[in-house]
Amino acid sequence: MRSFMVSRGCPYKCAYCFNHKYNMLYKGLGPLHQRMSVGRVIAELRDLKARYPTQFIKFYDDIFVLKDDEWLDEFSERYPAEVGVPFHCLMRANLLTESVLLKLKKAGLASLSMSIESGDDHVRNNVLKRNMSRKTLKDAFALCASHDIPTFSNTIYGVPGTTLDQDIGSLDLNIECGVTFGEFPLFFPYPRTELAAYAMEQGAFDGDFDSLHMSYQAGSPLKCFSKREKMRQKNLSLLSTVCLMIPALRPLVVNILIHLPLSGLYFYLYYIVKAYIIKTRIYPMKLSLKDALRSIWESFTLERFKHTEEAFKQALGGERRR
């Protein structure tokens, strides 16, 4: 799989993202969103294919399509004819129409990312600044399902001022939307973002960014949650991915499993489900046995680090000793 970007910039102001600060830096110096011509995209991707074996493209643009326009028309015609590699891209649910989805599918869309972020309307729209209704989210995911496009969603747990019940409500919205695969990271206060400032104003974070884990999946760094609450958040984060694959497990997960000190076991369940869904539905590729084993080992090692606080402490200790 190769990662690629055709544009830069995002006009939206999600509170957890750097883009609103980035846009302020370049205000008045040009359009917020800039995109390559289709011709240049095709030329670069053809060169990529000529240089390296390429089975799949992941377009990492913040939003791959902002509107149904001539660029998308040209892309949907030329990409399958001149590149012909299945791809994944990121969209906002409020921008997805049937016309846009059909053009992307014609081009070779294999799966699509659309973030939900929270099942609570107040948190999603007033705290995270997503400005999206439940109906908009449900309609967008239903549209993908109707055209057999697997979906990948992100949802944030442990936002300052929220409860475990609200996080469970976020899981429920993912299940209602029929999300194929989802990640449920815990809130992480990135420096100079609006949400980090909000966490400090709430007294939930002391502003010591250097003490944070490198990964937003290791555990909540906030002071407003007890140790037991953080354990439940982490367990729910891991098991929510499993619930999307097997929704019938939801009652067992939220009523019993998240309350048990078994995060280590739940990590393995999470990893198995993630590895299976990612490789078969989200980024489907054919790998040799050697490449498959290498991929499993590398991804497992990375996931274990991202979800383990102790690994970071050891790395940090090594840095300080040097």
Q: Where are these predicted regions, by residue range?
A:
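Radical SAM [4Fe-4S] cluster-binding motif and immediate context
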Residues: 1-152, 172
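Glycine-rich, positively charged active-site loop/lid region within alpha/beta enzyme cores that binds
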Residues: 16-21, 204-211
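Radical SAM enzyme core and accessory elements
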Residues: 28-31, 46, 194-197, 213-322
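Conserved strand-turn element in the central/C-terminal portion of the radical SAM core barrel
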Residues: 64, 92, 117-124, 128, ...
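Catalytic cores of alpha/beta
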Residues: 100, 160-176
